[in-house]
């Protein structure tokens, strides 16, 4: 996947991404934070439960980091139009609007991230690609 989220010719992937459907139920993920030099700074596992509500979906996340830190977050995701979604959570520092294009779901936002014992305002550029009905690859670029 290119930095802008384009699939580099992978247009054959036809799994339409609907966040309100994909995030419903129980989810698991693993990931890591890598600095701009390619050094892994932090690893995590994430478990989440998505609960369908009248206004969209509520996603209850728990992050377990390799340094023993645990972080809980609740996202509220609601549809704004056919291909636009809005996300809300307590640590947002800006609007969070996402767009779906086929199997791609992308959104960007400013966020207060807990890092090394303090809260740091960062910018997330998030791109998710739905590969199969139950598999998504997520690339989140985090910058200050």
Can you name each region flagged by the protein language model?
Residues 121:
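Active-site glycine-rich loop that binds ribose-phosphate moieties when present
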Residues 1-41, 45, 49-53:
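Amphipathic/hydrophobic helical signal segments and adjacent flexible N-terminal regions
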Residues 30-115:
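Central antiparallel beta-sheet cores of small beta-barrel/beta-sandwich binding domains
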Residues 26-28, 97, 127:
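Residues located in well-ordered beta-strands
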Residues 125-126, 130-144:
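Glycine-rich, aromatic-bearing surface loops/beta-hairpins
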């Amino acid at each position: 996947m290119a930095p802008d989220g384009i699939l580099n010719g992978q247009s054959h992937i036809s799994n339409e991404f609907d966040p309100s459907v994909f995030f419903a139920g129980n989810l698991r993920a693993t990931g890591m934070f890598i600095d701009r030099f390619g050094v892994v700074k932090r690893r995590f596992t994430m478990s989440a439960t998505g609960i369908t509500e009248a206004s969209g979906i509520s996603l209850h996340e728990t992050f377990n980091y390799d340094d023993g830190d645990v972080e809980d977050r609740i996202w509220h995701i609601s549809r704004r139009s056919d291909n636009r979604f809005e996300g809300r959570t307590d640590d947002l520092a800006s609007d969070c609007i996402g767009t779906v294009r086929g199997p791609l779901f992308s959104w960007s936002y400013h966020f207060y991230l807990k890092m090394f014992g303090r809260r740091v305002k960062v910018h997330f550029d998030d791109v998710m690609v739905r590969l199969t009905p139950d598999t998504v690859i997520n690339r989140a670029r985090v910058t200050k």
